[in-house]
């Protein structure tokens, strides 16, 4: 049970804006060791042409954004809950 706000950010399936250099995964590096109490909000970037898998970004209470390792059981559970809840 999380007490921080979460956001799902679906990206357009065909992003033909001429800025192909931006079509890449946001999370090139992830972390797995963060205490959930230090997180103020979560953002999910859905999979698409820019990246083959969804990405989970956490904003720490300090304002710093970090990417969470979606293979960790806790983060997998959070990601699944967010994706399932927002696709209705």
UniProtKB/Swiss-Prot annotation:
Glycans are attached at residue 7. GO terms for molecular function: chemokine activity; CXCR chemokine receptor binding; CXCR3 chemokine receptor binding; heparin binding. GO terms for cellular component: extracellular space. SMART domains: SCY. Its main location: secreted. Heparin binds at residues 76-82. GO terms for biological process: adenylate cyclase-activating G protein-coupled receptor signaling pathway; antimicrobial humoral immune response mediated by antimicrobial peptide; cellular response to lipopolysaccharide; cytokine-mediated signaling pathway; inflammatory response; leukocyte chemotaxis; negative regulation of angiogenesis; negative regulation of megakaryocyte differentiation. The modification Phosphoserine is found at residue 41. InterPro entries: Chemokine_b/g/d, Chemokine_CXC, Chemokine_CXC_CS, Chemokine_IL8-like_dom, CXC_Chemokine_domain, Interleukin_8-like_sf. Disulfide bonds join 25-51, 27-67. CDD domains: Chemokine_CXC (cd00273). Homotetramer. Interacts with TNFAIP6 (via Link domain). Interacts with CCR1. Interacts with CXCR3. Interacts with THBD; this interaction enhances generation of activated protein C. Belongs to the intercrine alpha (chemokine CxC) family. This is Platelet factor 4. The gene is PF4.
């Amino acid at each position: 049970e999380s007490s921080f706000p979460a956001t799902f950010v679906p990206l357009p399936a065909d992003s033909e804006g001429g800025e192909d250099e931006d079509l890449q995964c946001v999370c090139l590096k992830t972390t797995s060791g963060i205490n959930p109490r230090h997180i103020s909000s979560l953002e999910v970037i859905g999979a698409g042409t820019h990246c083959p898998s969804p990405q989970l970004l956490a904003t720490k209470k300090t304002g710093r954004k970090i990417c969470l390792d979606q293979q960790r059981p806790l983060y997998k559970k959070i990601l699944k809950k967010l994706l399932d809840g927002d696709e209705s």
